[in-house]
């Protein structure tokens, strides 16, 4: 077995990247954590939800505390550069990593934890309202908004499912379908019985103060009336971060747009793992931590069983 500069390189320093690094640090592994300062998907969120012991804590604080823990491990090194190239060396069963300053190093295993970027719909004025009024996870914020007027934006077949889930938190729910609503007669009857309103008008623009009520300006509204909502839930489309590196390694991407992984979060390329939001549609902090721990556990066991390692 050849000598490598590090046992593992972790690309990405959000929740999943930090969790994987912490696990491997406790396993006494040599780890390089590559943090290009990209920020986490939820870096603007005020709270991290459904994380045991961190009920009212900001994502920034959790990440800061974890980084402080990592400072205690002398085999963990940090790097603020970007990874430009990853080349597998099959004869050595390792990888050659080239960084953005043209330096290179060798590692036994690679963990991608670079996440995804959400893509907001093309609605004028929507950007400032993300994520203070625009949400993709009702299980995080909806309880705090219970009883307030809410909206769903879903110009696809998910509108019925989303309405059935979200109506639990409010009796004043409007579903924007951006055109003809594709509900069956049975579904439409059920939504009517629940008091859920369907609006097929196009949203031309939104305005207001982020974190307060949003004004929805609708197409064809001759009276120029606006609909006030405290928040709008959207099943957002997203794109993988660091797609160039993913394609460079020829990793398989699923039809849903995530990296294909096995039960240990190993990708289609042996020795390369993907954790967090880029590897699963259950895109929560809790899953980011789980996937990172599973991958790190599998890597440590695999390296331990290599001959003469």
Regions found by a protein language model. Give the residues of each.
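FAD-site-proximal beta/loop scaffold in flavoenzymes
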Residues: 128-144, 236-282, 294-297, 301
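A conserved FAD-binding loop/helix module that cradles the flavin
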Residues: 21-22, 160-162, 275-309
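Residue-level detector of alpha-helix initiation sites
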Residues: 14-15, 118, 157-158, 279-280
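FAD-binding core/adjacent interface of flavoenzyme oxidoreductases
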Residues: 1-9, 77-147, 218-223, 233-235, ...
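A Rossmann-like FAD-binding core segment of flavoenzymes
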Residues: 64, 70-99, 104-107, 170-258, ...
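Beta1-alpha1 glycine-rich phosphate/pyrophosphate-binding loop at the start
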Residues: 6-64, 158-181
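Short hydrophobic beta-strand segments
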Residues: 148-155
């Amino acid at each position: 077995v050849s000598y490598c500069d590090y046992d593992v390189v972790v690309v990405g320093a959000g929740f999943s990247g930090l969790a994987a690094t912490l696990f491997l640090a406790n396993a006494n592994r040599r780890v390089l954590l590559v943090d290009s300062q990209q920020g986490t998907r939820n870096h603007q969120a005020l709270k991290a939800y459904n994380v045991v012991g961190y009920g009212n804590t900001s994502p920034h604080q959790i990440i800061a505390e974890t980084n402080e823990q990592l400072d205690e491990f002398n085999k963990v090194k940090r790097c603020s550069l970007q990874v430009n190239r990853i080349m597998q060396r099959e004869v050595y069963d390792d990888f050659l990593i080239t960084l953005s300053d043209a330096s290179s190093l060798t590692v036994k295993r690679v963990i991608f934890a670079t996440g995804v970027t959400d893509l907001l719909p093309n609605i004028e004025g929507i950007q400032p309202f993300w994520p203070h009024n625009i949400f993709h996870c009702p299980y995080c914020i909806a309880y705090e908004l219970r009883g307030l007027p809410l909206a769903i934006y879903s110009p696809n077949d998910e509108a019925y499912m989303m309405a059935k889930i979200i109506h639990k938190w409010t009796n004043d729910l409007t579903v924007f379908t951006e055109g003809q609503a594709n509900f069956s007669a049975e579904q439409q009857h059920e939504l009517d019985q629940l008091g859920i309103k369907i609006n097929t008008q196009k949203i031309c623009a939104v305005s207001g103060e982020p974190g307060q009520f949003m004004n929805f300006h609708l197409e064809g509204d001759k009276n120029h009336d606006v609909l006030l909502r405290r928040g709008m839930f959207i099943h957002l489309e997203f794109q993988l971060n660091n797609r160039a590196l993913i394609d460079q390694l020829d990793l398989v991407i699923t039809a849903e747009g995530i990296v294909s992984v096995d039960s240990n979060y190993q990708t289609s390329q042996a020795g390369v793992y993907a954790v967090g939001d880029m590897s699963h549609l259950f895109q929560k902090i809790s899953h980011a931590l789980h996937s990172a721990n599973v991958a790190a556990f599998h890597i440590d066991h695999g390296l331990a069983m290599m001959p003469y390692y």
